[in-house]
């Protein structure tokens, strides 16, 4: 994963760990990793920290090479058409991981925004990753480009974006690890509240604003044929 991260231009990677809250062995176990989502480089970057399973779109399984590894990592594939109860799959995986934590089951990484963004703010979180009411480990990723090109994969078609990513001078990446977030009784009973409070905590620690928009707004925009062009 070091090679893949370097190949995607992540030349400088720094991990910043919060010094507040319980440390190391004192930390409660969190079966879920929650992160913002900026680029496809986010996945190998999280893999450098540990080897979690990933929640991914169902069509990811059909992508050559990537689909093979996604299945090997025991990813949870979600169907946005609603034909498969994705929330139930995610919730059950979290419960199974928590029950088998002593057996070394990989944690489940969720990009809670449900899509990629430009990384300048946190859009509203989807509730699926919070339905189990179990603790989560938040991470906040940020990129800084050494050239004019942004690695954010938010509104450019895939092949042009990959071409410019591989052609750029590279990026510096900062990964902020927050304390494990343990939900209150009220948050466990209300996944929407739990998701929003985790988003607020991530925004506060990362000094990142919260945006009043969600992944469906982005999909609606792209559905109208709005894509970013490289000048």
Predicted region positions:
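Eukaryotic intrinsically disordered and solvent-exposed regulatory patches
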Residues: 16-21, 25-26, 39-42, 63, ...
């Amino acid at each position: 994963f070091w090679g893949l991260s370097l190949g995607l231009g992540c030349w400088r990677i720094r991990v910043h760990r919060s010094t507040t809250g319980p440390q190391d062995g004192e930390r409660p176990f969190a079966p879920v990793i929650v992160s913002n989502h900026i680029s496809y480089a986010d996945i190998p970057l999280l893999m450098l920290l540990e080897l979690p399973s990933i929640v991914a779109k169902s069509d990811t399984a059909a992508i050559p090479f990537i689909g093979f590894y996604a299945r090997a990592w025991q990813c949870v594939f979600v169907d946005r058409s609603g034909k498969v109860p994705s929330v139930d799959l995610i919730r059950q995986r979290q419960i199974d991981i928590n029950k088998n934590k002593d057996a070394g089951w990989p944690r489940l990484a969720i990009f809670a925004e449900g899509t990629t963004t430009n990384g300048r703010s946190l859009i509203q979180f989807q509730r699926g990753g919070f339905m189990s009411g179990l603790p989560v480990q938040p991470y906040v990723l940020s990129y800084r480009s050494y050239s004019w090109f942004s690695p954010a994969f938010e509104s450019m078609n895939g092949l042009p974006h990959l071409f410019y990513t591989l052609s750029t001078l590279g990026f510096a990446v900062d990964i902020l690890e927050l304390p494990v977030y343990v939900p209150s009784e009220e948050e466990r009973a209300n996944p929407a509240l739990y998701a929003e409070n985790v988003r607020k905590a991530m925004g506060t620690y990362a000094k990142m604003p919260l945006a009043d928009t969600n992944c469906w707004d982005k999909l609606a925009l792209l559905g109208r044929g709005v894509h970013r062009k490289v000048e």
